[in-house]
From Swiss-Prot:
GO terms for biological process: symbiont entry into host cell; virion attachment to host cell. This is Long tail fiber protein Gp37. Proteolytic cleavage and release of the chaperone in the host cytosol stabilizes the folded protein. It comes from Enterobacteria phage K3. Belongs to the S16-like long tail fiber protein Gp37 family.
Length: 1243
């Protein structure tokens, strides 16, 4: 039995202390209170541990209320159950670990700085992989998945799951066999090298369904990029808006503000400004995009920056080469501004080659005028048989108008019409199938003596060349043909050969005249000339060297010279001059009784009779009845003269030489130019007049009644008349002409029109004068008028303009002013200025009532209104005074009177323009036409081919109509009714526009509302140029396939949009490849998109990438934001797991180094804590982390803390792990120094 001593306990409070054998008796107990262990001494004197760790068997249950510590293995051959935790210092092994409540926890081993792991091992204990959670910061957490790369590898692959930015997942590579669904993806490079054939790199096929116009939801925002923080931001957008073509476009701005480029679903591409192709050099300078200084703001350059197309203005662009304009393209022409060359060359003109056989270098589509020459086209440089030919065709004419004419070299000109042709050769030859006919005279203009018409000798026997005038049938034409020809018979083989050369004029009935040279006879060396006339010969002059023989009657019209007198016995009619010289008695006219001889004696010509019965040969007698003095023309009749026939064998005027009297028994009429009846008084003081009397009583006289020079026409019967004095004409009674009478008061009355009463007419006259307002524009006082109410009217016409420049025709202007008073309810004066052009002298008008019915009129005049012609008139109850009329330059007033009232200015429709401008009518107000057919526009008056267009409003519809074309000049078609075509009409009730004869749109067309294609119609695109097929867009479908919009060519469909009967939408492309960059709204990859906005989803509807603002790109997982990219920062709202994190720390990037002082003290002020953390301030805690508090770190090391924003935009603090490491490094170095110091002391 043990003694009491043996069951008493010896105690120790020092951990790890075992009792010595000397202090215990056998069986005596000792307890270590610190370690909770019991010891005793066995019979061998050894100290043994009585705790469970000493071994032994326990039969039955063991209840331990405290801690069970087992330093060795625990072998359990049954079930192991615990209601609490199992804590192992090393590891716990089992075949299977199963969490019946659904949770496994792995806790970091050493506070908040160690990892929490879940390991995967091979059978030999080597690592396969591990899932572990990294230490947390105050804001971030991270779980990593590390996988060993094979049993023979020493490297691992790690995958990170981070809490930042709403959650991030990081892997060197993500491989999804089916799909990867996420709201946001942040990558440097997306590689699709191993994708299957036919797969797309990405999808953004949004399924927006929107009502109304869809202007907003019809936009798919694809990408937004820039190169630097302050760089231009580019937006890639796909649109499918109602009323617009589907389009991909690229915009710039913080938001899509400025559209730069676009490509539509019909293949059209548009750029904001210009396009440069093939101009890039190294480093991509801005100058590669074209030379704006040379090419302008809008251009297309090719190859270099100053070659291409340059836009100039609406409808006009230039072809530019090397910075120089070489051609301008306008709406109506192609204008070459440099030397134009058309040719075919394979080396830019170094060598030129022929065009293809039967092809031209330049063809003009002149077949439009339906000419039937060849193919109707004009060809320049046409290869026909290897030779260059040129063809000009058309139903009109070709005009060549050059100052020095036209040269054809070599000189061959061939004119062809059907089977006929005429050829002109430079050697002078003309060859014609038909006779050459001249519509006008042939004039040989050369001054040399060889110019003339020459006829070669014909090659045919007995042939001759003739000039022939064909006979006609109209008035004034010759009936028979007339021929002039030369021939002869000297070379005849037989017969008469005496006529060497014959010149003959004949018609179809025989010869008129011939002259021939006879062959010489006898001793003659030159044959004589003979002429023969077949009929009468009428000649102005005939000079016969030899015999002159006339068989019939001869009429000599010209001069006849007879050197030995002339005896005419058969009568002679001479219409020309007869010259008789060398004799005094030149001409005798005689009969058997008397002869009358025309005799010239020195300076006189006499007609002298012969003595009786000496008519033929007698000499002159002594009578001189008629003589003319040839020097003075004085005619002398020295015997009695009787002029006229009184009916009683005496003359009406009888001059008696013997009685020295003149008797006149008839009225005298002097009716010759410069004829006069002269009364010559013997002295200047004598009276000189014609006196009239009746029955011996003086009744009138005309002349000078005394010594003065006043001429009187005086009626002695009435006692008054007309006196013409030196400075005036006096009349004492009114002067009457017809019914018109000039009174002694100066008034003219009794006439017609203005002369019914001249004083009244003058009172109503239009006054005129001039005014000058000079170089200064402004308000001028123009006139003062007195105009009673009810009513009076005045008008002014001002002719001239503002300025006087050559070529500015608008300065030749007419302005008119009309003033009219009111009806006294109230009293007023209306003023209207009618003007015609911008160059008018007067621009505005104002009226100021001075008092009563008196008004001042003011006008606003332009500059340089010099020398304006002015007319004015008014009703009889009004008066006008024009200020400055016919006077010097007027000055403008400083200001209009306060009581002045503006009148109205009316612009008169006119088409006056300055030089160089197209004439047109301009109006600043509407023009109302009260006719259903309001305007008719004729293309070329009433000429052939002219056509008229008309604007018509019949009350139901508005039409644009046109007539047929005029067939001939002056035809009435162009002025007649419209034809049956209705190219354009507007229903005036519904507003519907009808184009009943088709429509051709040559440029872009904009439709701001719907386009309805009815009756299964289609939109067709005809092939042209290099396009191989026709294209069309049409509406198709049936009950099984629903509705389709289909794009097809002549062979097959290309693509169609379909809404299936079930409501699903499809877009199908027939075996097509879509390349390039497309722009669209939000879309999903193998899923729909629920993120909206500018986003891409992957796999599920709320996981993907989304742009949430300018410079903000977020990644979502299950609609939770896990990551954000923005300028300067990268945010993760979840933990980030990575195999390693490398932060740029190159010393070459750093400067201004300073040590972290008192690092250990700073560390001791920090607290590592475990906490629950929310995603944003005020949000729910979403995870438990370990870390430090940013505010505490900021107190000791502010450089390690930075302010940023949480996902809700709240300002929060973040910490730098690199800064913390630097702080800990310095603290460890300080602690290490202290340990070394303590170790040195212990040593």
């Amino acid at each position: 039995m043990a003694t009491l001593k043996q069951i008493q306990f010896k105690r120790s409070k020092i951990a790890g202390t075992r009792p010595a054998a000397s202090v215990l008796a056998e069986g005596e107990l000792a307890i270590n209170l610190k370690d909770s262990t019991i010891f005793t001494k066995d019979d061998s004197g050894n100290i043994i541990d009585l705790s469970i760790s000493a071994g032994g068997n326990i039969s039955g249950n063991v209840t331990i209320d405290g801690t069970l510590r087992v330093n060795g293995p625990i072998n359990n051959f049954g079930n192991f159950s615990t209601s609490g935790q199992i804590t192992a210092g090393s590891s716990i092994s089992a075949q299977v670990f199963r969490a019946l409540q659904g949770s496994f926890y792995s806790r970091a081993s050493t506070g908040e700085t160690a990892n929490a792991h879940l390991w995967f091992e091979n059978a030999d204990g080597t690592e396969r992989g591990v899932i572990y959670a990294r230490p947390q910061t105050t804001t971030d957490g991270e779980i990593r998945l590390r996988v060993r790369q094979g049993t023979g590898s020493t490297t691992n692959s790690e995958f990170y799951f981070r809490s930042i930015n709403g959650g991030e997942f990081q892997a060197n590579r993500i491989l999804a066999s089916d799909s990867l669904v996420t709201k946001r993806i942040a990558v440097d490079t997306v590689i699709h090298d191993a994708k299957a054939f036919g797969q797309y790199d990405s999808h953004s096929l949004v399924n927006y369904v929107y009502p109304g116009t869809g202007e907003t939801n019809g936009v798919n925002y694809l990408r937004k990029v820039r190169a630097k923080a302050a760089g231009t931001m580019w937006h890639e957008i796909c649109t499918a808006q109602t009323g617009q073509a589907d389009e991909m476009s690229w915009w710039t701005g913080n938001t899509p503000q400025s559209k730069q480029y676009g490509i539509r679903n019909d293949g059209r591409i548009a750029g904001r400004n210009s396009l440069a192709l093939g101009t890039f050099t190294t480093n991509f300078p801005s100058s590669d995009y074209g030379n704006v200084g040379v090419m302008g703001d809008k251009y297309l350059v090719l190859g270099d920056t100053v070659t291409g197309l340059s836009y100039k203005k609406t409808g006009v662009f230039d072809l530019v080469g090397g910075g120089y304009s070489v051609a301008s393209i306008t709406p109506d022409s192609f204008r070459s501004t440099r030397k134009g060359i058309f040719g075919r060359s394979e080396d830019q003109g170094a060598t030129w080659i022929m065009p293809g056989t039967n092809a031209a270098l330049l063809s003009v589509q002149t077949q439009a005028d339906t000419n039937n020459a060849g193919d109707g086209q004009t060809h320049i440089g046409y290869n026909a048989g290897g030779k260059m030919n040129h063809y000009f065709r058309g139903t009109g004419q070709m005009n060549i108008n050059t100052q020095q004419g036209m040269e054809i070299n070599p000189g061959i000109l061939k004119l062809v019409t059907g089977s006929n042709n005429v050829q002109f050769y430079a050697d002078g030859n003309i060859s014609s199938i038909q006779p050459v006919k001249l519509d006008n005279e042939l004039f040989l203009n050369s001054s040399n003596n060889t110019a003339g018409l020459k006829f070669g000798a014909p090659s045919k026997v007995d042939g001759t060349r003739a000039i022939q005038w064909n006979g006609g049938t109209r008035e004034g034409q010759n009936k028979n043909y007339v021929i002039i020809k030369a021939w002869g018979n000297s070379f005849n083989a037989t017969g008469d050969r005496s006529r060497e050369t014959v010149f003959q004029v004949s018609d179809s009935q025989g010869y008129y005249f011939y002259a021939h040279r006879k062959a010489p006879t006898g001793d003659e060396t030159i044959g004589r000339i003979e002429a023969q006339f077949a009929g009468e010969l009428n000649a102005k002059s005939i000079n016969a060297v030899e015999n002159f023989k006339v068989n019939g009657l001869s009429t000599l019209v010209g001069g006849v010279t007879m050197s030995n007198g002339l005896n005419l016995t058969g009568g002679s009619s001479i219409t020309g001059q007869v010259k008789i010289g060398g004799t005094y008695d030149a001409l005798r006219i005689w009969n058997s009784r008397y002869g009358a001889i025309f005799r010239r004696s020195e300076t006189s010509l006499h007609i002298i009779p012969t003595n009786e019965n000496e008519g033929e040969n007698g000499a002159i007698n002594n009578l001189r009845p008629f003589s003319i003095e040839l020097g003075t023309g004085t005619v002398s009749m020295l015997h009695d003269v009787h002029l006229g026939n009184s009916g009683s064998s005496t003359g009406l005027l009888q001059v008696s030489n013997s009685l020295k009297t003149i008797k006149m028994i008839c009225p005298v009429t002097i009716n010759e130019r410069n004829a006069a009846l002269t009364l010559d008084s013997p002295s200047s003081s004598s009276a000189n007049y014609l006196q009239g009397s009746k029955a011996g009583t003086k009744s009138w006289y005309v002349g000078l009644g005394g010594a003065g020079n006043d001429l009187s026409l005086y009626s002695q019967s009435y006692g008054h008349g007309l006196v013409i004095s030196d400075n005036f004409v006096s009349i004492s009674k009114p002067l009457k002409v017809g019914n018109a009478q000039l009174g002694t008061d100066g008034n003219i009355t009794g006439g017609s029109g203005n002369f019914a009463n001249l004083n009244t007419t003058l009172n109503r006259k239009v006054n005129s004068g001039f005014i000058t307002y000079g170089a200064t524009s402004g308000w001028y006082k123009f006139a003062t008028v007195t105009m009673p109410q009810s009513t009076s009217t005045a008008f002014f016409k001002i002719v001239g303009g503002s300025g006087f420049n050559s070529g500015l025709f608008t300065q030749c202007n007419i302005a008119e002013i009309v003033l009219r008073t009111g009806n006294e309810r109230p009293a007023d004066l209306n003023a209207v200025l009618y003007t015609r052009t911008i160059g008018a002298a007067f621009k505005n008008i104002a009226v100021n009532n001075v008092s009563g019915d008196t008004y001042d009129i003011y006008v606003y005049a332009g500059t340089y209104c010099n020398q304006l012609a002015c007319e004015w008139a008014c009703t009889e109850n009004a008066t006008i005074s024009v200020i400055g009329i016919n006077s010097s330059t007027q000055s403008p007033v400083d200001d209009l009177p306060d009581t002045a009232v503006n009148g109205q200015v009316a612009n008169v429709l006119n088409n006056l323009v300055d030089s160089g401008k197209g004439k047109r009518y301009e109006a600043e107000s509407e023009i109302a036409i009260n006719s259903q057919t309001g305007i008719r526009i004729r293309s070329n008056a009433d000429k052939t081919g002219s056509v008229a267009t008309m604007l018509r409003n019949d009350g139901g519809s508005f039409y644009i109509l046109f007539t047929d074309k005029n067939d001939t000049d002056g035809a009435a078609t162009v002025n007649g009714e419209w034809n049956s075509k209705r190219p354009f009409a507007i229903n005036l009730t519904t507003g519907e526009v009808m184009m009943n004869n088709g429509i051709a749109v040559r440029s872009a067309a904009l439709f701001y509302n719907s386009i309805n294609v009815k009756d299964n119609g289609s939109i067709n695109f005809d092939k042209s140029g290099a396009n191989p097929r026709n294209m069309r867009i049409f509406h198709a479908g049936d009950a099984s396939r629903g509705n389709r919009i289909e794009i097809a060519d002549e062979t097959n469909y290309i693509a169609y949009f379909e809404k299936a009967p079930g409501g699903a939408n499809r877009f199908v492309v027939n075996n097509a490849t879509v390349s390039g960059v497309n722009q669209m709204n939000s879309f999903g990859v193998n899923t729909s998109n629920a993120l909206g906005g500018n986003s891409i989803t992957f796999g599920d509807t709320d996981t993907g990438i989304k742009q949430n603002g300018d410079g903000l790109l977020d990644i979502y997982a299950n609609n939770a934001q896990v990551f954000r990219f923005q300028n300067g920062d990268l945010y993760s709202y979840k933990n980030i797991n990575a195999p390693n994190v490398y932060i740029r720390s190159d010393i070459r990037l750093k400067s201004n180094f300073k040590p972290i002082e008192n690092a250990l003290d700073k560390v001791e002020k920090l607290n590592g804590v475990i906490y629950d953390k929310a995603e944003y301030i005020g949000g729910e805690a979403i995870e438990t982390e370990a870390g430090i508090v940013a505010q505490t770190l900021q107190d000791v090391l502010p450089e390690a803390v930075r302010e940023t924003e949480d996902s809700k935009g709240n300002k929060i603090l973040t910490v730098s792990s690199q800064a913390q490491i630097a702080l800990l490094v310095e603290a460890v170095k300080t602690l290490s120094a202290r340990v070394k110091e303590l170790e040195s002391k212990l040593m």
